[in-house]
Regions:
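Juxtamembrane amphipathic/hinge helix adjacent to a transmembrane helix
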Residues: 222-242
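Alpha-helical transmembrane signal-anchor/signal-peptide segments
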Residues: 11-33
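Well-ordered beta-strand positions in beta-sheet-rich domains
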Residues: 20-22, 193, 230-232
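Internal alpha-helical transmembrane segments
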Residues: 1-19, 53
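Generic detector of well-ordered alpha-helical segments enriched in charged/polar residues
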Residues: 10, 49, 107, 230-232
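Soluble non-transmembrane domains of integral membrane proteins
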Residues: 28-30, 39-224
């Protein structure tokens, strides 16, 4: 009898995870925070820019957020770190970075409108300089990269989500983490399509809002295209609640 009571008590106290889905008409979020940490092995920092666009027709290189760019030597070691900004090109500096076969790490966050859109990591913004460096034999670039992190929303609750709901659920907020794309001949761009789902986690103590996402990707071939990584995203009208 005591054993039966103990089993019932354990079952009662055990936290069980379940989920529901619904359309959240009161979500009221107008901005989406994008968190990135990406190593781009064969594009120097001074030739790399972030371009954003959305379904409303907004296109910009003026990133709202905090991004750092770290110059990487050809072995991946950090040379220095500076605030990301789009600035007037310094040809001689770009040429030196290209000759040294430098790469770049982009890390931090920026905000976009909470509508379908995309962000592009590319050398196309400095296309004329890139073409000149290639013609002069100083630059060999490609779209090889490693995604250390891409996630959406605030990250301060991630540990609590992991602790309360387990890694199989929590990792859905980091679906692209540690994805690596090695160099493939004639591959100019890697396309990623992300479906972002607003997610709400409810515990006995608090309510935590986050975003999960799934993705598909493919390599786009083109000899004359600028090496780029293109992330297209769409926000689901459905909210998942745990």
């Amino acid at each position: 009898m005591a054993l039966l009571f103990l089993n019932e008590l354990i079952n009662y106290l055990t936290y069980k995870t379940s989920s529901i889905m619904y359309v959240d008409v009161n979500r009221g979020v107008d901005k989406l925070k994008v968190n990135i940490d990406i190593d781009i092995s064969h594009i120097p920092c001074d030739l790399l820019s972030i371009l954003t666009s959305d379904a409303l027709g907004e296109r910009s290189t003026d990133i709202k957020g905090e991004i750092t760019k770290s110059r990487l030597d050809k072995k991946g070691k950090i040379l220095d770190t500076n605030k990301y900004e789009v600035k007037e090109p310094n040809f001689e500096k770009m040429k030196l970075e290209a000759k040294n076969e430098e790469g770049c790490n982009l890390q931090g966050y920026f905000f976009v409108d909470a509508v379908p859109g995309s962000f592009l990591l590319t050398s196309a913004y400095y296309g004329n300089i890139v073409q000149r460096l290639i013609m002069e034999g100083d630059l060999k670039i490609n779209a090889e990269h490693k995604i250390n992190q891409i996630s959406f929303g605030e990250t301060n609750n991630r540990y609590d989500i992991w602790s309360n709901f387990g890694k199989n659920i929590a990792k859905l907020s980091y679906s692209l983490n540690n994805v690596k794309k090695n160099y493939e001949k004639y591959t100019s761009m890697y396309q990623y399509y992300l479906k972002i789902v607003p997610t709400k986690y409810i515990t006995f103590k608090n309510v935590m809002n986050d975003y999960q996402y799934t993705y598909n990707s493919y390599a786009e071939r083109g000899i004359h295209e600028m090496p780029s990584m293109h992330f297209r995203y769409d926000l689901s009208p459905i909210t998942v609640e745990y």
